[in-house]
Amino acid sequence: MSVIKCNPTSPGRRHVVKLVNGGLYKGKPYSSLLSKKVANSSKGRNNYGRITMRHIGSGHKQRYRIIDFKRNKDDVFAVVERMEYDPNRSANIALIVYKDGERRYILAPRNLNVGNKIISGLNVPISPGNSLPLSNIPVGSIIHNVEMKVGKGGQLARSAGTYVQIVSRDGEYIILRLRSGEIRKVRCECRATIGEVGNNEHMLRALGKAGASRWRGIRPTVRGTAMNPIDHPHGGGEGKNFGKHPVSPWGVQTKGKRTRSNKRTDKFILCRRKKK
């Protein structure tokens, strides 16, 4: 993959930084693994038509690719048929073909190439793309697509360039270190995939213009100080100073206030994530 900075032939090209990956498949996605529902069809509205998620709307139509996060087809080898772009996530995806002819999409790990063989199971080799329980993975290994509940499918480390490291074992639990700095316990029966997620240069891209955000369904974000008092607690007044602690449009503190409400699973978090 190469990073290309565009020439300033126009104001919209001046700040664009693109990622070019010549190994991605140029054709249409595998139709049997596409969801019937359009991925971005709600536009941030609920069934009453009211905005439930701000700054979302319009954007190009996106078909959702059904990704196999469970990797529960054990002891059957699969071959990587092709690598594809997925508009619904920062990571690329890989189309794999099992020996019996079944095809599935998986997250494309780093250093996984077309033609490589991968397998899932209880005791499989430790190589990128293979999936197995945490209890059978050596301490210190780099993994991704980690389950938090047995059989539910991977939930941790699914974005481009992310990974989780196994720190130690504690009886029936495995202690993991996340990229955020959080250290937490997960059941040893939970599965994970070896390696880190690919496309780690994703963070280097720059959209370069407002229209590129609109193509992705991202609408403008207006500052609260630029609004009227009826629209935002920061609105109104003379000058730019709003004279209070920063809050959301609904009056909730917006800098530093903890929003985690699931106290039931606090016992699994040994160390909270680092402050940015």
From Swiss-Prot:
Pfam families in the cross-refs: Ribosomal_L2, Ribosomal_L2_C
Region forming the signal peptide: none
GO terms (BP aspect): cytoplasmic translation
Keyword match rRNA-binding: yes
Keyword annotations from UniProtKB, A to Z: Ribonucleoprotein, Ribosomal protein, RNA-binding, rRNA-binding
Ranges where the record places region Disordered: 224-265
Keyword Nucleotide-binding set for record: no
The organism's place on the tree of life at top rank: Bacteria
GO molecular function: rRNA binding; structural constituent of ribosome; transferase activity
Alphabetical list of Gene3D superfamilies matching this protein: 2.30.30.30, Nucleic acid-binding proteins (2.40.50.140), Ribosomal protein L2, domain 3 (4.10.950.10)
An annotated GO cellular component: cytosol
Description of how the protein assembles with itself and partners: Part of the 50S ribosomal subunit. Forms a bridge to the 30S subunit in the 70S ribosome.
Function: One of the primary rRNA binding proteins. Required for association of the 30S and 50S subunits to form the 70S ribosome, for tRNA binding and peptide bond formation. It has been suggested to have peptidyltransferase activity; this is somewhat controversial. Makes several contacts with the 16S rRNA in the 70S ribosome.
Recorded family membership: Belongs to the universal ribosomal protein uL2 family.
Protein known as: Large ribosomal subunit protein uL2
Organism: Blochmanniella floridana
Name of the gene encoding the protein in the UniProt record: rplB
